[in-house]
Amino acid sequence: MGKRIIPQRRGKASPVFKTPDHIHVAPARYPLLDPSKTYKAVVEDLVHDPGRWVPLAQVKLETGLVFYVPAVEGMYAGQIIEIGPGAKPVNGNILPVGMIPEGMQVVNIEKRPGDGGKFVRASGTYAVIVGRAGGKTQVQLPSGRVIEVPNESRAMIGVIAGGGRLEKPLLKAGAAYYKWSAKSRVWPKVRGVAMNAAFHPHGGGSHQHVGRPSTVARNTPPGRKVGHIAARRTGRRKG
């Protein structure tokens, strides 16, 4: 009798597949503030969040409110930052994209005013303000794609910290194990053709091959629904 394949185990949501959110620090987003006022705040600390690749900055407003945002390069504990339309466009300050000069590097950009930040939050990334038209600001994302967001959407000046993360080699499998363990992802990722027949529909045989068409129907039952699911076509394009 066959065993449950990994997608079936993931659907059951055992602890291996659950995010350990009890060790996460806090959501990283801008607080809801009066958009007409400019606030001063202090960076109290830079903290590590096991659920992220990016360090978080613990920021305390002059009103006493504490929140967390992804830290930018050059940010330090004790730094005074400004938040609002009257803030200067310098590293670490948060202000509406409509107030940021063209050509500046920005991160953690709001898709809609007040959502806390949706774009450009990964380590070492930044976007560039490229232009404005009709109440919207054009921003070039790290992928090269240009998007438009309302002028009232907020962003932070700078480059997300942790950009050298991928430069350090893991060197051994144990390091990769602990790396992905903190993110609650299954590692290592084993190919189906490398498994025994009892553990995957593509497993078994004297050499690694699928042994049957890898395309399956949309309504295929769990345990068999692997490979190219409801594929219109597979293989190399011809002509």
Curated annotation (Swiss-Prot):
The keyword Nuclease does not apply. Keywords: Ribonucleoprotein, Ribosomal protein, RNA-binding, rRNA-binding. GO terms for cellular component: cytosolic large ribosomal subunit. One of its GO terms (molecular function) is rRNA binding. Residues 225-239 have a biased composition (Basic residues). It holds the Pfam family Ribosomal_L2. InterPro entries: NA-bd_OB-fold (IPR012340), Rib_uL2_dom2 (IPR014722), Ribosomal_uL2 (IPR002171), Ribosomal_uL2_arc_euk (IPR023672), Ribosomal_uL2_C (IPR022669), Ribosomal_uL2_dom3 (IPR014726), Ribosomal_uL2_RNA-bd_dom (IPR022666), Translation_prot_SH3-like_sf (IPR008991). Residues 202-239 are annotated as: Disordered. GO terms for biological process: cytoplasmic translation. One of the primary rRNA binding proteins. Required for association of the 30S and 50S subunits to form the 70S ribosome, for tRNA binding and peptide bond formation. It has been suggested to have peptidyltransferase activity; this is somewhat controversial. Makes several contacts with the 16S rRNA in the 70S ribosome. Part of the 50S ribosomal subunit. Forms a bridge to the 30S subunit in the 70S ribosome. Belongs to the universal ribosomal protein uL2 family. HAMAP family: Ribosomal_uL2_A. This is Large ribosomal subunit protein uL2.
